Amino acid sequence: MAPIFDLLQRRKGRFVLWSPASQSVPRLILGTFKATPSPGAVTTLFTGDLSQTQNGLWELASDTIQPPLQNDKVYHYWFEVDNTYPTSTGSGKIKITDPLAYTVDYRQFADQPRAASMQPPAVIKFRDGKLWPCDIDGTEVERVPDPVQSQVPPNNQMVIYELPASWAKSGPNGKQIDRGTFADVQALFDKATPGVRFSSISAVRKEAIVADLGINALELLPIADSKYQDQWGYSTAHYFAPDADLGSTASLVDLIQTITPSTRLILDTVMAFGHDPYIYAAFMQFHLVALDPDHPNDPLQKFAEPGNADSYTSHNQGPRNPYGGSLWRYIKNPQQTYDPQTGQASLKHPPSWSFHRAHLHRWLLDFGVSGLRLDSINNVANYNFIKYYKDYAWQLHQARGGSTNKFIVIGEELSVPKDLLTSGTLNALWNEPFQGRIRAAIVGEAADGDNFEWTVRKMVDCTLDGYTDGAQAVNYITSHDVEGNRKERLYNFLSNCKVSDIERRAKLAFACFLTAVGIPMIFAGEEFCDQMDLDISEKQSDPVNYERKSDDWRTRVFNYVATLVDLRKNCPALGVDDTSFIHVDQSRGGKIMAWVRGTTNPVVVVANFTDQDTPGAQYFVPNWPDRDRNDWREITQNRAVPAAWVGKEPLMHWEAKVYTCWKAGAVNGQTNGVNGTHSG
């Protein structure tokens, strides 16, 4: 049975505001939304005081409201509170969104710029004497069933697809950029779903492009509600609500039910800073002012706390960055106030710790989430909190009968501190050095002070670089952080390196990437060599252009990648850490190499990192395992290898070949070769 979260339970029959700040009595402002005249507005029906039932907890029972709430009716509401923002002026009162809102409604603001101070009303439905979460049209959404563990891919066989909401399509004046919706994402998995804003794109309307790719874990860039419409959602405002611009909660549930259980949902969460209502309702309890030495005369700076360790990043590498929001406060003395998790009167941790556990509770139990990616751990800068959060995620997962190898908490900390893994603070890290090594290798360079051979060795086997298990390392050629030198999309990187054979190099990169030890993560669009449409400085707006997938050469890259994805997620040899290098050709500068993954029915990769084909009709690779077997296959070309040619096939320049004797069958309760058209 799942743990009870007291604050969330209370909301079923009451309007509840948890605010440990000292303040005057908050008020509920409640009404109904009328769509006409456009853009619509909320008509106020009731204004009344909340009562303090515990220190820091304010409530108003729904059955005490007069006139009585109507059954089966949708209501919109705000809380009116003291404005605690450090530089606030004026009346001292402000209407705020319920910090726990499951749905928010921006319709009354129409096309107004969404300033950080904008507070949309929360939405709730009154039915049978209780308050029910609902969409703005009144639809009540059932929670997603717990993932069926026998059908969930294990961590060591995941292939993650990192998908932003910003997409591009052709318009009358060139490229038109828009945000995809949950329905558009569903269309990438389901041919029967046409999508909404991108139905004009063949890859969205006629194909199930991501299903065809074959990934089995989807990481949508933050889907909790953000006020900003032109970015990827790293400015979370309403942590419990799906992003209103991406669609309704019902459409999110439709998406999840389409992809699960065979595809895992990874939740991307931003907890270094927020744009949430507590900035106004209880600033000093939940937030702190960021240090800004470049603007010492900014009025906010007199409220900054240079003596507080909470103001600095991990390892004191400089001030934390709020990126236009407000930093979450993670260091604060215990308070004799309401604990929203236990319901007791003594809060043992800073309020932000409990707030973040509360929305974690919501997402894991209501949406079947089976993994987390925590953004910018060094900017959160509190490893004790991260472990506290991770431990609760695992408690929730295990309470629903979850398997130990079918849930994961991944952290983004680009200095890759392995102590976060050995201490149990996190399960995995983004393996940032992998990106540098693979990009160096495909242009014939070494990286990180190693020679070329060791650049490739560490790229292929992360256990040579401090990891103790491949499931601790999330590898990527490209991530959504496409800003900076050698971080851009693969197409742009190769173009900037004056590479003319981009298709060949991209295939080489993916052959190494999808056979390496670690969890592979594909940034959306890289599977067909998408390119950047915007200036590199606009990384959180740069769109994915699925129209490009129809280019002939890009379709070839896509099919090549899909073939290897199918192998990666199904072949047992790629789900273990066992790796041995059997050949380094010193006569060619150590740049033709061969390595073996796994022991039983292994995978052998032979790669040529030079601009020269191997000479002669044969290229002999010594130490080839099971050379006498007659069932070797080359995966990327989907062909059998004649027994006389095992370990002897030539290589073209910048080419990798991937061999195995393994054949598709039942593995871990799953049927292999799901994407049969791409299977090797």
Predicted feature descriptions by range:
Residues 19, 643-676, 680:
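C-terminal beta-strand-rich structural cap/linker in extracellular carbohydrate-active enzymes
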